[in-house]
Amino acid sequence: MLDEIVLKEIPGHQKIYHRIGQDILIDQKINDWIKQLREKGRAGVRAPHEIEDISYIADEMRLIKSDFEIDMMRRSAKIASLAHNRAMKFVKPHMYEYELEAEIMHEFMSQGIRSPAYQSIIAAGGNACTLHYINNNSEIKDGDLILIDAGCELEGYASDITRTFPANGKYTKIQTDFYQMVLDAQSAALKMISTKHHWNEPHEAALSVLIDGFRDFGLCQGSREEIYETGAYKEFYMHRTGHWLGLDVHDAGEYKNVSKEWKQLKPGMTLTVEPGCYIRPSSKVPKEFWNIGIRIEDDVLVTQDGHEVLTKESPKTIESIEALMAK
């Protein structure tokens, strides 16, 4: 049936628009249709002679959110924020990570959300140093930091939040120092989110703060420029500072334009800002730093006047987190 319809409709058209590479069977089907039409060329049937990948066109449209989409993303971000707050208030040493995951899901479902936007990460202690840890089955020990990366999906629109907080409600001195470094890196990145800046500037701003911090802690040696050029910082910070957000958690859209320059930020774009620090056990690292894993992630909307943090209802300063956990 489909073959009959397509073979009737596409003759005489110059171009077929198609998302190339997403489904190899559909790719082959289109090639077969064109081949069949070309075989009828002597009968005056004109086959399309171009196939254009529609991905770039559709992805560019998805970069700028409509008012409806922004409203959905605000609501999704609020629900995810409430879920993170619930986990902070619920946690106790000697619980298991999956118990916090259950609290996250409880909040999602009580707000009408049937599923998370992605597999939630509930990582206590050294588990937080594994970027995509999803086992969520370890016991939470007194003194652990807990990294939760969790978001929900509302009407197809994703939220994506990470918070890192102490299992016992109080950051230690070392945890405080590293946490503040990551928070300062995020603050520096947020200052670069406006229509005056391009995509990579928030990452560059966050990375500068982190590199300086790694030097101060003795984790990296040399000048900021040397550490950047050699990539020595990647032992402790190995990912980018953000990604597009929307219908997918890592949403569609290029990060550079056709001239290979970073895209300028525009009103309606939505992205994450998520610097981190991950210190695995190593003979090169002071033992008191081992197993510290911290990430702070917010969802951000670019506006005419700057930006709006959509996930602002979940606390992230040391004082505000400790105050919430003490309630």
Positions of PLM-derived features:
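Active-site neighborhoods and metal-handling regions in enzymes and metal-associated proteins
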Residues: 1-327
